[in-house]
Amino acid sequence: MVYLVGAGCGDYDLITLRGLELIKKCDVLIYDSLIDKELLEYAENAEKICVGKRSGAHSETQKTINSLLIEKARENKTVVRLKGGDPFVFGRGGEEIIALKEGDIPFDIVPGISSAIAVPELAGIPVTHRLTSRSFHVITGHTAEDILPENMKAY
């Protein structure tokens, strides 16, 4: 079984209770570089594998990470894939569940707090407000071609 767990953004205590419990019980912890390293201490008996990726600096390819998830799950190990923020907000969680489905590996998702929500909130800025904004948009600074549209309006 593989659990894709969002670590939240920033401090270790922003992870969900469910995410923390899974870290404590897992056999293998496969983690990104953007997590608070204090979370690693909760996986006392787990095999810990860093697969951290940042723009332009990848310790492992996504294909290698996907294969590692499948390999460890096929060894009948409980695997936590710990990702910064939320697994499905620019976290490649979608790519990982596609690989798990193709490998016939059971999985579950534990959402995390995305910086897209947390940063403005911690600064006291609501991302929506009934009187001024009914929606908000999250846009990456990186595209497949590393080019943002020139016609994107700023508000």
Question: Residue locations for each model-derived region?
Answer:
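Beta-strand/loop-alpha-helix module characteristic of Rossmann-like adenine-cofactor folds
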Residues: M1-V5, F107-D108, A116-Y155
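Class I S-adenosyl-L-methionine
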Residues: M1-A7, Y12, L17-I113, A118
